[in-house]
Amino acid sequence: MKLCFNEATTLENSNLKQDLELCEKHGYDYIEIRTMDKLPEYLKDHSLADLAEYFRTHHIKPLALNALVFFNNRDEKGYREIISEFKSMMETCRTLGVKYVVAVPLVTERKILKEEIKKSSAEVLTELSDIAEPYGVNIALEFVGHPQCTVNTFEQAYDIVNAVGRDNVGLVFDSFHFHAMGSNIESLKQADGKKIFIYHIDDTEDFPIGFLTDEDRVWPGQGAIDLDAHLSALKEIGFNDVVSVELFRPEYYKLTAEETIKTAKETTEAVVSKYFMKEA
């Protein structure tokens, strides 16, 4: 399995340029590029061509643009903005050689029926699939384990992906989000591993379902999530692609970027290596 770095892990103590240099130094294979902050910051002083050249001349490669945010159940103006943003992302993907865009569902205090959420999500993802197909880009739906997210369990997200029925539309499986809203491990064991495009690894303090927030994440293997169950299930269903470490821990932002990136790799590999070999 290949190792990826999600830039949320150094959100407040690094930038894209430094993330790339340190991930290259410490042997990461991939990086998920944050499009809402770190990429725009980089582009103030560099071009996309500069970034493409960096990837061309180094081991580390771009895995995904993270993320197309709140894509479903939008008003007409919001919908048009999502489509426009996604089309722009496709050009970025083409320039950099990115194969995935992470799509995050709407988070809202408004109550929306699950049927309406599924209908909107499937319709938008189908349109995005059509747009992405000529670029060879895949869309990875990331359910978010929070009560106010419109798609907040593995089962709900998997049902939407099945409704879309496109080869280039799949899931992000995030251990934190899976745990945070009580998704069922049996559902993962029965899933098609080909529908899981990216695995986000993390861990968390032991708060009740519905109370967990991103800031509660801790280094893999140092929290309450049964990562052994997640990893063994992923292996069982044939997933063996990329594991991406994603944390949002405020106290980790107080470390040096290098210490964060190094520790993230060490703790991830210690957990994952029990089930998957590191690919050369």
From Swiss-Prot:
Pfam families: AP_endonuc_2 (PF01261). Involved in the reversible interconverion of 2-keto-myo-inositol (2KMI, inosose or 2,4,6/3,5-pentahydroxycyclohexanone) to 1-keto-D-chiro-inositol (1KDCI or 2,3,5/4,6-pentahydroxycyclohexanone). Pathway: Polyol metabolism; myo-inositol degradation into acetyl-CoA. It is an enzyme of class 5 (isomerase). This is Inosose isomerase. It comes from the Bacteria. It comes from Bacillus velezensis (strain DSM 23117 / BGSC 10A6 / LMG 26770 / FZB42). Binds 1 divalent metal cation per subunit. Its EC number is 5.3.99.11. Its cofactor is a divalent metal cation.
